[in-house]
A protein has these predicted regions:
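Enriched for short, Lys/Arg-rich terminal
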Residues: 2-5, 16, 20-26, 58-61, ...
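N-terminal first-folded block
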Residues: 7-40
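Nucleotide phosphate-binding site architecture
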Residues: 12, 47, 86
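A short, surface-exposed loop/turn module that caps and links secondary-structure elements
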Residues: 31-57
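Residues that form or immediately flank small-molecule/cofactor binding pockets and catalytic motifs
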Residues: 10, 51, 81
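Charged, low-complexity, helix/coiled-coil-prone segments
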Residues: 1-8, 46, 50
Length: 87
């Protein structure tokens, strides 16, 4: 059973903008999110100040998320260029 998806208003705006500017990247992102909802463990576990979060790479961009096991949900936290997302 797939996990529920949780996003923020900020990510929703990013996704809407991406769907208009780069349809191919948006399609790839959408497929990757579906994969994550089916198997949240596919992302790379992060360390340091981002411990507990996971990332998947989509071209030069990274999608950061966390798994909320108690709620059977995946919360998307950030999506940005690789150089900017790791702060």
């Amino acid at each position: 059973m797939p996990y529920e998806l949780i996003t923020s208003e900020n990510l929703d705006r990013i996704f809407v903008k991406l769907s208009k500017k780069d349809k191919l990247q948006f399609e790839i992102l959408t497929r990757k999110i579906k994969e994550i909802l089916e198997n949240p463990q596919i992302g790379e576990p992060l360390k340091g100040n981002m411990a507990g979060q996971r990332s998947v790479h989509i071209r030069n961009f990274c999608l950061i998320y966390e798994i909320l096991e108690n709620e059977k949900a995946v919360k998307l936290l950030d999506y940005d260029h690789h150089d900017k997302v790791y702060y």
